[in-house]
Amino acid sequence: MRILFMGTPDIAAESLNALIAAGHDICAVFTRADKPVGRKQILTAPPVKQTAEANGIPVYQPRTLRDGSSDELIKSLAPDIIVVVAYGCIIPPQLLHVAKYGCINLHVSLLPKYRGSAPIQWAVLNGDAETGVTIMQLDEGVDTGDILYVQPVAIDPDMTSGELFDRVSAIGAKTLVEVLPKIKAGKLTPKKQEESLATKAPSLTKEMAQFDFTQPAAHIHNWVRGMNPWPMAFFMHDGKKIKVTASKLSENPANAAPGSVLAVKPLTIACQDGAIVLDSVTPEGGKSMAGTAWAAGRRLKAGDSL
Protein backbone atom coordinates (compact mmCIF):
# COMPACT_ATOMS: atom_id res chain seq x y z
CA MET A 1 0.00 0.00 0.00
CA ARG A 2 1.02 3.60 -0.56
CA ILE A 3 1.29 4.99 2.97
CA LEU A 4 1.63 8.47 4.39
CA PHE A 5 3.14 7.89 7.83
CA MET A 6 2.76 10.32 10.73
CA GLY A 7 4.72 9.72 13.93
CA THR A 8 7.53 11.01 16.11
CA PRO A 9 9.11 8.92 18.94
CA ASP A 10 10.79 5.51 19.12
CA ILE A 11 7.55 3.54 19.14
CA ALA A 12 6.58 5.20 15.85
CA ALA A 13 10.02 4.58 14.35
CA GLU A 14 9.69 0.86 15.11
CA SER A 15 6.35 0.77 13.29
CA LEU A 16 7.80 2.71 10.35
CA ASN A 17 10.70 0.28 10.10
CA ALA A 18 8.27 -2.65 10.10
CA LEU A 19 6.19 -1.12 7.31
CA ILE A 20 9.31 -0.49 5.22
CA ALA A 21 10.52 -4.06 5.80
CA ALA A 22 7.09 -5.38 4.75
CA GLY A 23 7.51 -3.71 1.36
CA HIS A 24 4.99 -0.90 1.69
CA ASP A 25 5.50 2.28 -0.32
CA ILE A 26 6.01 5.04 2.24
CA CYS A 27 5.35 8.13 0.12
CA ALA A 28 6.26 10.59 2.89
CA VAL A 29 6.65 11.02 6.62
CA PHE A 30 5.22 13.79 8.78
CA THR A 31 6.87 14.27 12.16
CA ARG A 32 7.43 16.90 14.85
CA ALA A 33 10.21 19.48 14.82
CA ASP A 34 13.79 18.73 15.83
CA LYS A 35 14.36 19.48 19.52
CA PRO A 36 17.32 20.28 21.81
CA VAL A 37 18.31 17.14 23.73
CA GLY A 38 20.57 16.48 26.73
CA ARG A 39 22.59 18.74 28.95
CA LYS A 40 24.29 20.35 25.97
CA GLN A 41 20.89 20.90 24.30
CA ILE A 42 22.01 19.50 20.96
CA LEU A 43 19.35 19.93 18.27
CA THR A 44 18.25 16.37 17.49
CA ALA A 45 15.89 14.93 14.89
CA PRO A 46 13.05 12.76 16.21
CA PRO A 47 13.50 8.98 15.72
CA VAL A 48 10.95 8.85 12.89
CA LYS A 49 12.81 11.51 10.94
CA GLN A 50 16.08 9.64 11.40
CA THR A 51 14.47 6.41 10.16
CA ALA A 52 12.87 8.12 7.17
CA GLU A 53 16.06 9.87 6.09
CA ALA A 54 18.03 6.63 6.40
CA ASN A 55 15.57 5.09 3.93
CA GLY A 56 15.37 8.01 1.52
CA ILE A 57 11.80 8.92 2.45
CA PRO A 58 10.69 12.59 2.18
CA VAL A 59 10.18 14.21 5.58
CA TYR A 60 7.87 17.11 6.46
CA GLN A 61 7.77 18.85 9.85
CA PRO A 62 4.89 21.34 9.92
CA ARG A 63 4.26 23.10 13.22
CA THR A 64 0.57 22.20 12.94
CA LEU A 65 -1.89 20.59 10.54
CA ARG A 66 -4.84 22.59 11.80
CA ASP A 67 -4.14 25.71 9.73
CA GLY A 68 -4.62 23.88 6.43
CA SER A 69 -1.16 24.79 5.12
CA SER A 70 -0.31 21.12 4.49
CA ASP A 71 -3.66 20.07 2.99
CA GLU A 72 -2.72 20.39 -0.68
CA LEU A 73 0.63 18.69 -0.15
CA ILE A 74 -1.03 15.73 1.56
CA LYS A 75 -3.63 15.44 -1.19
CA SER A 76 -0.91 15.57 -3.86
CA LEU A 77 0.90 12.65 -2.21
CA ALA A 78 -2.19 10.53 -3.00
CA PRO A 79 -1.75 7.97 -0.21
CA ASP A 80 -3.89 4.83 -0.05
CA ILE A 81 -3.96 5.24 3.73
CA ILE A 82 -2.62 7.55 6.42
CA VAL A 83 -1.03 5.71 9.35
CA VAL A 84 -0.58 7.60 12.62
CA VAL A 85 1.57 6.37 15.51
CA ALA A 86 2.26 8.80 18.37
CA TYR A 87 2.50 11.79 16.05
CA GLY A 88 1.80 14.47 18.64
CA CYS A 89 -0.34 16.68 16.38
CA ILE A 90 -4.10 16.72 15.97
CA ILE A 91 -5.24 15.46 12.56
CA PRO A 92 -7.93 17.94 11.42
CA PRO A 93 -11.28 16.76 9.99
CA GLN A 94 -10.46 17.70 6.39
CA LEU A 95 -7.59 15.18 6.32
CA LEU A 96 -9.37 12.18 7.85
CA HIS A 97 -10.82 11.00 4.53
CA VAL A 98 -8.22 12.20 2.03
CA ALA A 99 -6.84 8.68 1.58
CA LYS A 100 -8.79 5.81 0.00
CA TYR A 101 -8.72 3.74 3.19
CA GLY A 102 -8.90 6.69 5.54
CA CYS A 103 -6.70 7.50 8.49
CA ILE A 104 -5.83 4.89 11.12
CA ASN A 105 -4.06 5.17 14.44
CA LEU A 106 -2.11 2.70 16.57
CA HIS A 107 -2.94 3.29 20.24
CA VAL A 108 -1.20 1.32 22.98
CA SER A 109 -4.10 0.40 25.22
CA LEU A 110 -7.28 -1.65 25.14
CA LEU A 111 -9.53 1.21 24.07
CA PRO A 112 -11.70 2.76 25.35
CA LYS A 113 -9.50 2.28 28.41
CA TYR A 114 -6.64 4.77 28.79
CA ARG A 115 -7.37 7.38 26.18
CA GLY A 116 -4.61 9.96 26.14
CA SER A 117 -0.87 10.39 26.00
CA ALA A 118 0.37 7.99 28.71
CA PRO A 119 -1.57 4.71 28.36
CA ILE A 120 1.44 2.47 28.99
CA GLN A 121 2.37 4.21 32.22
CA TRP A 122 -1.16 4.22 33.62
CA ALA A 123 -1.63 0.53 32.93
CA VAL A 124 1.43 -0.15 35.10
CA LEU A 125 0.58 2.47 37.73
CA ASN A 126 -2.82 0.84 38.20
CA GLY A 127 -1.32 -2.64 38.50
CA ASP A 128 -3.07 -4.04 35.43
CA ALA A 129 -2.11 -7.54 34.32
CA GLU A 130 -2.94 -6.81 30.69
CA THR A 131 -2.95 -3.97 28.21
CA GLY A 132 -2.97 -4.08 24.44
CA VAL A 133 -2.60 -2.53 21.03
CA THR A 134 -5.65 -1.04 19.33
CA ILE A 135 -5.81 -0.15 15.64
CA MET A 136 -8.56 2.41 15.24
CA GLN A 137 -10.02 4.79 12.69
CA LEU A 138 -9.23 8.38 13.56
CA ASP A 139 -12.11 10.77 14.11
CA GLU A 140 -12.30 14.29 15.51
CA GLY A 141 -12.02 13.17 19.14
CA VAL A 142 -9.02 12.04 21.18
CA ASP A 143 -8.72 8.26 20.81
CA THR A 144 -12.48 7.98 20.30
CA GLY A 145 -12.61 6.49 16.80
CA ASP A 146 -14.07 3.15 15.76
CA ILE A 147 -11.96 0.10 16.62
CA LEU A 148 -10.67 -2.07 13.78
CA TYR A 149 -8.44 -4.55 15.60
CA VAL A 150 -7.26 -5.31 19.13
CA GLN A 151 -4.19 -7.29 20.22
CA PRO A 152 -3.91 -7.97 23.98
CA VAL A 153 -0.48 -7.68 25.63
CA ALA A 154 0.45 -9.21 29.00
CA ILE A 155 2.08 -7.09 31.73
CA ASP A 156 4.51 -9.01 33.94
CA PRO A 157 4.16 -8.38 37.72
CA ASP A 158 7.49 -6.53 38.10
CA MET A 159 7.62 -4.94 34.64
CA THR A 160 8.41 -1.22 34.39
CA SER A 161 6.77 1.20 31.99
CA GLY A 162 9.99 1.25 29.99
CA GLU A 163 10.02 -2.52 29.65
CA LEU A 164 6.34 -2.59 28.71
CA PHE A 165 6.99 0.17 26.19
CA ASP A 166 9.55 -2.05 24.45
CA ARG A 167 7.15 -5.00 24.41
CA VAL A 168 4.21 -2.98 23.14
CA SER A 169 6.34 -1.23 20.50
CA ALA A 170 7.37 -4.55 18.96
CA ILE A 171 3.88 -6.06 19.13
CA GLY A 172 2.32 -2.85 17.80
CA ALA A 173 4.62 -2.76 14.78
CA LYS A 174 3.92 -6.42 14.00
CA THR A 175 0.17 -5.92 14.43
CA LEU A 176 0.15 -2.91 12.14
CA VAL A 177 1.82 -4.90 9.36
CA GLU A 178 -0.67 -7.75 9.79
CA VAL A 179 -3.73 -5.48 9.83
CA LEU A 180 -3.07 -3.39 6.71
CA PRO A 181 -3.83 -6.21 4.20
CA LYS A 182 -7.07 -6.91 6.08
CA ILE A 183 -8.06 -3.26 5.78
CA LYS A 184 -7.32 -3.30 2.06
CA ALA A 185 -9.35 -6.48 1.61
CA GLY A 186 -12.29 -5.06 3.58
CA LYS A 187 -12.12 -7.85 6.15
CA LEU A 188 -12.36 -5.65 9.25
CA THR A 189 -15.62 -4.28 10.60
CA PRO A 190 -15.30 -1.01 12.55
CA LYS A 191 -16.72 -1.23 16.07
CA LYS A 192 -17.94 1.70 18.12
CA GLN A 193 -16.20 2.28 21.44
CA GLU A 194 -18.25 1.78 24.60
CA GLU A 195 -18.23 5.26 26.12
CA SER A 196 -19.27 4.02 29.55
CA LEU A 197 -15.96 2.12 29.79
CA ALA A 198 -13.74 5.04 28.76
CA THR A 199 -10.91 6.15 31.06
CA LYS A 200 -8.17 8.73 30.61
CA ALA A 201 -4.38 8.45 30.64
CA PRO A 202 -3.05 11.99 31.12
CA SER A 203 0.61 12.89 30.82
CA LEU A 204 2.76 12.30 33.89
CA THR A 205 4.37 15.11 35.87
CA LYS A 206 7.32 15.10 38.25
CA GLU A 207 5.03 16.02 41.13
CA MET A 208 2.85 12.96 40.53
CA ALA A 209 5.83 10.68 41.15
CA GLN A 210 5.89 11.23 44.92
CA PHE A 211 4.66 8.50 47.26
CA ASP A 212 4.81 7.89 50.99
CA PHE A 213 4.81 4.77 53.09
CA THR A 214 1.31 5.33 54.48
CA GLN A 215 0.11 3.98 51.14
CA PRO A 216 -0.33 0.24 50.43
CA ALA A 217 2.82 -1.66 49.47
CA ALA A 218 1.28 -2.82 46.17
CA HIS A 219 0.45 0.78 45.24
CA ILE A 220 4.01 1.93 45.96
CA HIS A 221 5.48 -0.94 43.95
CA ASN A 222 3.21 -0.08 41.02
CA TRP A 223 4.24 3.57 41.34
CA VAL A 224 7.92 2.63 41.21
CA ARG A 225 7.34 0.50 38.11
CA GLY A 226 5.01 2.92 36.38
CA MET A 227 7.18 6.01 36.87
CA ASN A 228 10.25 4.25 35.46
CA PRO A 229 12.02 5.49 33.30
CA TRP A 230 10.43 8.93 33.84
CA PRO A 231 9.94 10.78 36.08
CA MET A 232 10.94 8.12 38.66
CA ALA A 233 8.95 7.56 41.85
CA PHE A 234 10.35 9.20 44.97
CA PHE A 235 9.81 9.73 48.68
CA MET A 236 11.10 12.53 50.88
CA HIS A 237 13.71 11.93 53.57
CA ASP A 238 15.28 14.75 55.60
CA GLY A 239 14.00 17.25 53.05
CA LYS A 240 15.61 15.45 50.10
CA LYS A 241 14.10 13.48 47.23
CA ILE A 242 15.02 9.81 47.22
CA LYS A 243 14.12 8.28 43.87
CA VAL A 244 13.35 4.56 43.83
CA THR A 245 14.39 2.90 40.59
CA ALA A 246 13.62 -0.71 41.52
CA SER A 247 11.52 -2.38 44.18
CA LYS A 248 9.69 -5.57 45.02
CA LEU A 249 7.00 -6.60 47.43
CA SER A 250 8.25 -8.18 50.64
CA GLU A 251 6.94 -11.61 51.53
CA ASN A 252 7.29 -10.84 55.24
CA PRO A 253 4.47 -9.25 57.26
CA ALA A 254 4.92 -5.68 58.47
CA ASN A 255 4.12 -5.51 62.16
CA ALA A 256 5.21 -1.90 62.47
CA ALA A 257 4.08 1.63 61.68
CA PRO A 258 4.23 2.76 58.03
CA GLY A 259 7.71 4.07 57.21
CA SER A 260 9.45 1.86 59.75
CA VAL A 261 12.67 0.19 58.65
CA LEU A 262 12.08 -3.54 59.03
CA ALA A 263 15.49 -4.59 57.69
CA VAL A 264 18.46 -3.06 55.90
CA LYS A 265 19.64 -6.19 54.06
CA PRO A 266 17.63 -5.86 51.90
CA LEU A 267 16.21 -2.43 52.72
CA THR A 268 12.63 -3.25 53.70
CA ILE A 269 10.09 -0.62 54.72
CA ALA A 270 6.69 -1.09 56.37
CA CYS A 271 3.73 0.33 54.45
CA GLN A 272 0.03 0.79 55.16
CA ASP A 273 -0.38 -2.91 54.54
CA GLY A 274 2.57 -5.17 53.90
CA ALA A 275 6.11 -4.05 53.20
CA ILE A 276 8.27 -3.09 50.24
CA VAL A 277 11.91 -3.78 49.44
CA LEU A 278 13.79 -0.82 47.97
CA ASP A 279 16.29 -2.56 45.72
CA SER A 280 17.75 0.52 44.05
CA VAL A 281 17.57 4.22 44.91
CA THR A 282 19.01 7.50 43.67
CA PRO A 283 19.49 10.15 46.37
CA GLU A 284 18.93 13.77 45.36
CA GLY A 285 22.13 15.00 43.74
CA GLY A 286 23.69 11.54 43.86
CA LYS A 287 24.11 8.40 41.79
CA SER A 288 22.01 5.25 41.66
CA MET A 289 22.91 2.71 44.33
CA ALA A 290 21.56 -0.35 46.07
CA GLY A 291 18.99 0.42 48.74
CA THR A 292 21.17 -1.40 51.25
CA ALA A 293 24.14 0.86 50.42
CA TRP A 294 22.02 3.98 50.83
CA ALA A 295 20.76 2.71 54.19
CA ALA A 296 24.32 2.05 55.32
CA GLY A 297 25.35 5.56 54.30
CA ARG A 298 22.48 6.99 56.33
CA ARG A 299 23.31 4.62 59.21
CA LEU A 300 19.77 3.31 59.20
CA LYS A 301 18.89 0.30 61.29
CA ALA A 302 15.82 -1.81 61.94
CA GLY A 303 13.31 0.19 63.95
CA ASP A 304 14.23 3.55 62.47
CA SER A 305 11.58 5.51 60.60
CA LEU A 306 11.57 7.10 57.16
Enumerate the predicted regions with their spans:
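A residue-level signal for conserved active-site and pocket-lining positions in enzyme catalytic cores
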Residues: 7, 29, 52, 82, ...
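N-terminal Rossmann-like dinucleotide-binding module
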Residues: 1-39
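Donor/substrate-binding cores of folate-linked one-carbon enzymes
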Residues: 22, 32, 81-200, 207
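N-terminal glycine-/serine-/threonine-rich beta1-alpha1-beta2 phosphate-ribose binding loop
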Residues: 36-78
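Acyl-group handling in specialized metabolite and lipid biosynthesis
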Residues: 202-215
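An anion-binding loop in the catalytic cleft
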Residues: 213-306
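Short beta->alpha connector loops
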Residues: 8-11, 63-66, 87-90, 227, ...
